């Protein structure tokens, strides 16, 4: 065996390096593939007049707005009737046009909202003026509270009738925990001058609890090719409106509850209410990127335990350009729900949206500070917000369609918008935060203490607690805002790539039940700028196996941190394997990457005749040569000495096993976090 080192100097190289990703949703055989929903055309430069001229000449019609700097949708003109063969002939001719860089048919992909049907069954829409007004008039000094919201610092509690049921704002979780949002509000932050867009099935822009905060510049209808994101009134398109209400429901209007960032501007993209193709996703992710600060998505591929799927080349390009040029170069912030496939033993590592370097992946916890039954585990999760587990537990309060309210929003669908709202508070505090700054401060301020009674907590080689279910802990709005106020932009990011190749050109055969280790020695890219402080770690792996779900991949860092990149998935009987799938871990954040990295490939197969081939793997290290600033409210290295807790600088890779250690650690970390927040 030998290893070969290459260095990637710019992010674009990384983008190009994963263009060969295969997805389970991609098909090429016409007899089994869905009909293309539309075709895209990319010109060498954006030119609306030329695009319409080309389309007209070939009996086509441009739909909607261009995206990605010169890419257009078009369909066969409504007055034309063309056979499949005739459509292909048109595309063939257009491929030879000198002004066209790309012409491609777009086929729909399966995308699912990450909520549950039971939430609709128990939903209690508090529609109205009758109950809501009656409740508001019973509140002492209600008008004084309403008036106070117009000032920088509100007087709590809010008069909104369902505010007291927003337990995740009001110390309502077991042990008196919440997401410390009131602390941010009382500092005067409510999301002013921050724009959030919900990428979903649309939002009801005239909802009385959203209308005052509605942002048309953060909204569009890609499914209907117009500017109105209003969802169809068919009972099945309430998801986006609910998510929008979590972020920016108006406070003090005696209707429903309040949004996390109740002064933020909220928009929506109607893109899930129709065929969802790569170009539909790309257009959504790149909408008005210099105006929109945060894109929130509570959907993804099938959470069925047998699918590998993620963004196509256009959507990956949209992510890349978003972080490079969005928000005037500071980078768009993409917040993503981690997935609801836990009951099917799915892993969010098989979801290419949550495993993107460019997304901030968010998990869920319940009111009793446990992991819900639907939760997926993976090492790309950064942090957690509250949601619910079943119909007997309080869920998330938000707006509903038509013009109503609900107490029953749930799933990781509910967690991502709460995170987006908390991030909006931090952006109001510091508009100069880059997309990487935001990942740093979310990770550093996430609070593990409420969730420590769950198994799986580990201290990484940089001394930080993490859990594959919850990331680095529960998001803490007060701590996030305080750290944002004093945060200095992180040093420039560098990327080093190490490729593992076999001694022989043929893939290595693997059979039955086995365990194999493949190691790479990392030196920190001495030939150029070194990576000495890790952020993201990606593994691009290629293999085939008789039953893909029998494989387990674990990555070990030089500091002893183990990340389960892919757990066994019993439902996954696919025999095609994966090709350069980008597994992502944030669990080694802050570590020094120099030393021996090992990828352990295991099989849980009981069938000796089940085999396959291991082809190659690459290790991509994202990080900096210099450390980010030292402010770290949750870093266990600041803990007082304790005989019951090992040093965070030891290579601790096992679970914190004993309840005595857990209790002691909780008490000490609580003291640390309280003091650290005050000092900020």
Q: Which residues does each PLM region occupy?
A:
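Secreted peptidase-domain scaffold signal
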Residues: 339, 466-468, 473-551, 613-680
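An often Trp-containing, charged/polar helix-loop segment at the C-terminal end
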Residues: 430-466
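N-terminal signal peptide
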Residues: 2, 11-26
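Extracellular S/T/G-rich loop segment that most often corresponds to the catalytic His/Ser-adjacent loop
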Residues: 200, 351-428, 432, 468
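Subtilisin-like peptidase catalytic core
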Residues: 173, 181-183, 194, 201-206, ...
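Surface-exposed aromatic
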Residues: 38, 64-84, 107, 111-113
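Protease zymogen maturation seam
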Residues: 95-194, 208-209, 226, 316, ...
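Short beta-strand-plus-loop segments that form exposed binding edges in beta-rich domains
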Residues: 600-609
